Amino acid sequence: MALNLQDKQAIVAEVNEAAKGALSAVIADSRGVTVEKMTELRKSAREAGVTMRVVRNTLLRRAVEGTDYECLKDTFVGPTLIAFSNEHPGAAARLFKEFAKANDKFEIKGAAFEGKIQDVEFLATLPTYEEAIARLMGTMKEAAAGKLARTFAALRDKLQEAA
């Protein structure tokens, strides 16, 4: 079905708005994936705070102009599914990576974060805010416990020398 000019402008504006508010973007080719599987992916995306859209490449090129995702233009070949992470930079990459494991025909073309093309593995393995805080707290706790142990050992050595 051919789109009229107003529809095309609305799509470009909608995708551009999503791109401006997104933390990262991932591009994929979903050719050969069943409708049921795509529906599951879309549902998972909504739950993860990811905005997904299938857009014509020419409209997508116009939509990402002036955004951090202009670097992805070379990946806009063939059927293009774009996903924007709104809550966590790795959400879309993690979602697509898991989906690609279960669906052979789903191909991830590229990802961008902070205006640069990034490896999908890098984005998918980024810790969430809660995970990062937990790691930091673990490191701080470990350092404090180590310092306490060294202090007690030094105190013990000093007392043994005095005796």
Swiss-Prot record:
CDD domains: Ribosomal_L10. Keywords: Ribonucleoprotein, Ribosomal protein, RNA-binding, rRNA-binding. The gene is rplJ. GO terms for molecular function: large ribosomal subunit rRNA binding; structural constituent of ribosome. GO terms for biological process: translation. HAMAP family: Ribosomal_uL10 (MF_00362). The keyword Mitochondrion does not apply. It comes from Haemophilus influenzae (strain PittEE). Part of the ribosomal stalk of the 50S ribosomal subunit. The N-terminus interacts with L11 and the large rRNA to form the base of the stalk. The C-terminus forms an elongated spine to which L12 dimers bind in a sequential fashion forming a multimeric L10(L12)X complex. Belongs to the universal ribosomal protein uL10 family. One of its GO terms (cellular component) is large ribosomal subunit. Forms part of the ribosomal stalk, playing a central role in the interaction of the ribosome with GTP-bound translation factors. This is Large ribosomal subunit protein uL10.
